[in-house]
Amino acid sequence: TVIFQNPDDREQFVSSGLVKSEKCRVVNGSGVNTNRFSVADYPDKITFFMLSRVMYSKGIREYLRACELVKEKHPEVRFMLLGACENIQDSLSKEDLAPYVEKGIIEHFGETDRVEDYYKQCSVYVLPSYREGTPRTVLEAMSMGRAIITTDAPGCRETVIDGKTGFLVPVKNAEAVAEKMTEFIENPELIKTLGAASAEYAREKFSVDKVNDDMCCHLNIERTNKYAVV
């Protein structure tokens, strides 16, 4: 049995002849601990947040450009970025980020083991990634009652019901990200209505216990720990 976290990857492997379709099973990512990442109150100031390694493939350039575009018209809005800069070809450097921080466009934070403290500070979570398995950060933000802006890309599109729990945008399109940010700003009631639906969707589809049950079922393994903590 071969386990995939999204149907796009499954289809790619099957169509390439790497695995037979009858051997494949799809689970909903790695799941999210809905107890740890529980619904939290929203901040007073509208705040957008991205948590990611600061890599091109995660959509960091699109996020920064979208923040810049929206900040010009809505200087009161807050934009956060949590993630380390790495010395690899696909990553922005601290020097690349510096102008955005110095101009007050974004607030950049390093690494932390208390990511939920940052989710609590945001109104909407943003991940303009080019491709994922299933993005755990999106699941965590959903579980905490945050509406999502992410891409219509493999792994990402499965996490959002477009228009109900958040919005899907095209890959590599900063203007589309900015447009959806603006929609939340101009219609702030969407933050709570889509956020509540997002939390419900996380519990229905992505809770870690449900995902682990599916995984064990596919692999014919009996679960001994029903309360896995992730």
Please place each PLM-identified region on the residue numbering.
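Conserved acidic donor-binding segment of nucleotide-sugar-dependent glycosyltransferases
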Residues: 162-163, 167-174, 183-189
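Aromatic "clamp/platform" in nucleotide-sugar-dependent glycosyltransferases that forms part
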Residues: 111, 130
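Short hydrophobic beta-strand element within catalytic cores of glycosyltransferases
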Residues: 147-150, 160
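A short, well-ordered alpha-helix in the C-terminal region of glycosyltransferases
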Residues: 176, 183, 190-205, 211-217
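Conserved donor-binding/catalytic core segment of Leloir-type glycosyltransferases
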Residues: 41-58, 63-68, 79-82
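Short beta-strand->alpha-helix junction loop in the catalytic core
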Residues: 8-9, 26-37, 53-56, 84-87, ...
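Short, structured helix-loop element that forms part of the nucleotide-activated donor/catalytic region
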Residues: 11-12, 78-105, 109, 190
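A short, active-site helix/loop in glycosyltransferases that binds the activated sugar's phosphate group
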Residues: 1-24, 31-34
